Each structure stands twice: as C-alpha cells, then as structure tokens.
Amino acid sequence: QINYISIKISGIYAQITPLNYEHNKAELIKRLSAIFRKAIEFPYKDENDFLRPKFVNLDMEEYKDTRLTLDVYKATLNLPEFKNYTAGIVVQTYLPDAWSFQTELLDFAHKRVMNGGAHLKMRLVKGANLAMETVMSSLKGWENPVYDNKIDVDANYLKLLDRALLPDNASVMHIGVASHNLFTIAYAHLLSKRYQVETFLSFEMLEGMANYLPRVLKSINKQIILYTPV
C-alpha cells in the first residue's frame, strides 16, 4: 500500500502565472488542503499495525515557483485542521537562497511545535534543473539563481545538513537526505549518531539506482524511502 507521495504545485494546478500570485496561492491552498484531507481520511498501517495518515511531500521545481511553494506549504499547514498533520517540503541546495529558505522553514516549524502542532519534514536535495536555470537566466539576461559549479552545490548541501541535524532543529523538522552519494550518506549517518538524532533522519533514493546503497542501509536499520514514478 502507498504511504508516501511527492507532488509539485504544477501537478495540482496547471494555470500558475506570476501575474496573479494571490489567486494562485489561494487556489493551491484549496487543492493542497484537499490532498491533505484525503491523506488523513485514508491512513495506512505501519509495521506495528498502527493507522497513520499518508505522508505528502511538496516538491520544488523552477526557482520562479519557490516562493509560491513555500508560502502555500506554510499557509496550508497553518490551517487549524492540519495542526496535528505532518507533511514535508523540499529544499534545493544548488540555490544560494537555500540557507534563507531553510531558516524560514525552521522558524515556522519551531513556532508550530511550540504551539502544540506536529513536527514537519525537510527533504534536502541538490536540485535537478541546474542547466535549465542557467540557460534560462542567460537567455533572459537575468542573474543566475543557482550555483555554477558542483563544489559549491555540494558544500551548500553539507552546510544545510549540519544545521538540520542539530537536535533542536531535527526534533521539530525531520530530515530526508536525498542522495546517492556515498560520502554524503556516510556524513549524514555519522553526524546523526553524534547528535543522537537518528530517529529523525531518513535516506531517500530513486528506485533502481545504486541498489546496493539501500541494501546496505537497510542492513544497519536505517530509515529508507525509495521513490518511483506512478
């Protein structure tokens, strides 16, 4: 049975336009709320036969939609009916703005938990649209919104991961390490052990890619999420 889905705002509303931000936001909140309600209405049974709401993760796309995605995520989860529901969101570390986005999400999660709400989850990815963002910004004469080399992207990933795994942060915003890089995975594993936050960490990979990695992680009882298109 399905217990976890990942969606994008363009997948639930195709008429997004920067010229009508408030309308886009209101429509997306309405549609994301409907998905959250169904996730709660049709729970799954975990390994101990407890019923739990299905998990919904809000993915990121182009840089131009990042602010809208963040605002929709926070506004929807601020609705009273979702106070006790846990949902996730992606942060792309190929964006220099990723640090400020993470800061915003951590502040939101801390306030939410302090007021009696459920914890949330942040899925750290490096980003899949680096070439497209670079070409698009060049064609339009805009400043490039992404780092232009892999070293900076990788360093930013570890920088955000360091802060995400701090005990006070990890307890209110769990972490999904989305990577097939052995160094990144080992780094996250060892750092989570040092901070004693292993229960707040999951490793997320694509089904069928580097199959030895999930096998090894499973052998040492790590939480693993495998993504596959449906």
Per-region residue spans from a language model:
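Positively charged, amphipathic and often flexible ligand-engagement surfaces
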Residues: 1-230
